[in-house]
Amino acid sequence: MKRTNRRAFLATTVTGTAALVAGALGRADDAKPQTSLAALILAGGQMAMAQARYAAMARQADADGYGQAASLFRAAARSKEANVTDLGAVIKKLGGKLECDAKPGEVKSTKENVAALIKAETEAGETTLPELVAVAREEKNKEAVRALNYAKAAAAEYATLFAEAAADLEAWKAGKKSVYVCTVCGFPAYTLPEKKCPTCFDALDKFTQVS
């Protein structure tokens, strides 16, 4: 196979893989990646699915009367959007392409959705993404390690924020809640950091307010 044809073949394969993993949230034991590119594709599919799912959960929270929880769900969706953009850019540099037909999946009551998000983000931050980082680190792919670590850090933050919400969910009914989201790495905060993003160290003008 000629080199140019091989690159086209690989790009097509990666695109197909993205479609297969787009529905994943959490571990994917039957599809453990062996390369940085495959790890990025898997993570990108997961992030795209989470983005769609959390946006749908935000709408459900609004319908259930949990305005502040809806704001946090919207922030989570915005963070995943940032992660998808970042991961997709690194995938492109490696000659791949991220194409995901992400659907929200099952959306239940707000209480159940909060619990589902905590479980998914905890698993992503503590297990799935660290495993993918290890794959990228083995190949010494610094860009892949960086992008995956950004996604991992954001997942850990949301697991904590939603655990706090779950502890007193009834208090999250009144009004909206402002969340500042870094559009580079997805880091969320209720108040702007003093000088720069604590995860990616970008300037504060990279933050967007979500409510």
What are these regions (language model features)?
Residues 2-5, 10-21, 28-211:
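Non-heme di-metal
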